[in-house]
Design a protein with these regions (language model features):
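AMP-binding/adenylate-forming catalytic core of the ANL superfamily
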Residues: 101, 106-107, 117, 129-215, ...
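Core-facing hydrophobic residues within beta-strands of well-ordered domains
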Residues: 5-8, 170, 217
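Beta-strand->loop->alpha-helix junctions that form or flank phosphate-binding loops
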Residues: 35-42, 71-73, 176-178, 221
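Gly/Ser/Thr-rich phosphate-binding loop
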Residues: 1-64, 78, 85-88
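Active-site glycine-centered loops adjacent to acidic/histidine catalytic or metal-binding residues
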Residues: 15, 39, 71, 128, ...
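Conserved ATP/PPi-binding loop(s) of AMP-dependent carboxylate-activating enzymes
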Residues: 56, 69-76, 84-117, 155
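Generic short beta-strand
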Residues: 64, 78-79, 129, 225
Length: 246
């Protein structure tokens, strides 16, 4: 037991969601060697960072909240969370993460329409939804295109996935919306079981104990694997296509 011993000093992670359940396992395995960087190709590796020192602050009263964040803004950029009207939101407000600085791209090659959509008034609109806390730590909620609107209420898939992954029989989970005549969209969870698939009633109970009832999946689909791209990210468009095809 305990972290393994080696000459490895730092292990940097990023490029996709790091679920809290997985991060806690990584800390148990590697010790306090972990650091996180959040960036995009349009603003490479320079939006926020969560340092090794922050990973080691186990005694802090908001340790788990900070661990679930992507850290604080890098010194070379300005970062803001903005609403649909373009105004910066106060701490706690969920909106789109926007970045400004010399490292931000000047535009997409030969694609003025995409450039105009992404760059507005000098700010890069990243397509990521998130919120700052009072101490300047940024927590990502989801990609804006993956947001589920059910009965007029927003459901952030990652919040549901985080809960499902706490079940010992769930190895992986990915949540998407399915079109619904009554609700607009309903929540569907694709689950890769660890061995035998867990009873749906257990997953329902787990969700009801941790999140609002309207966020609970209406359907669970147990699969052998989730579709991923060459970066290892889950391709949710493929999951939505599967639902659309029945």
């Amino acid at each position: 037991g305990g972290p393994f011993q080696c000459n490895l000093r730092t292990l940097v992670y990023g490029g996709g969601p790091m679920y809290l359940a997985d991060l806690e396992v990584a800390l148990e395995t590697f010790g306090e060697r972990l650091a996180q960087i959040y960036g995009q190709g349009e603003s490479p590796m320079t939006i926020t960072a969560l340092s090794k020192a922050r990973h080691a602050e186990r005694g802090h009263p908001r340790y788990l909240e900070r661990l679930a964040s992507v850290g604080t803004p890098h010194c070379v950029v300005e970062v803001a969370v903005r609403g649909e009207d373009g105004r910066a939101l106060a701490p706690g407000g969920i909106g789109e993460v926007c970045v400004r600085g010399d490292v931000v791209m000047s535009g997409y090659w030969n694609d003025p329409a995409a450039t105009a959509a992404a760059l507005r008034d000098g700010w890069l609109w990243t397509g990521d939804l998130g919120a700052f806390d009072e101490d300047g730590f940024l927590t990502l909620k989801d990609r804006s295109k993956d947001l589920i609107v059910s009965g007029g209420s927003n459901v952030y898939p990652r919040e549901v996935e985080e809960v499902l992954l706490t079940h010992p029989a769930v190895a992986e989970a990915s949540v998407v919306g399915r079109a619904d005549r009554e609700w607009g969209e309903v929540v569907v969870a694709f689950v890769v079981p660890r061995g035998t698939a867990p009873p749906v009633a257990e997953l329902d109970r787990l969700c009801l104990d941790h999140i609002a009832r309207f966020k609970r999946p209406r359907e669970y689909r147990f699969v052998d694997r989730l579709p991923r791209n060459h970066y290892g990210k889950v391709v949710k468009t493929e999951l939505r296509k599967e639902l659309a095809g029945g």
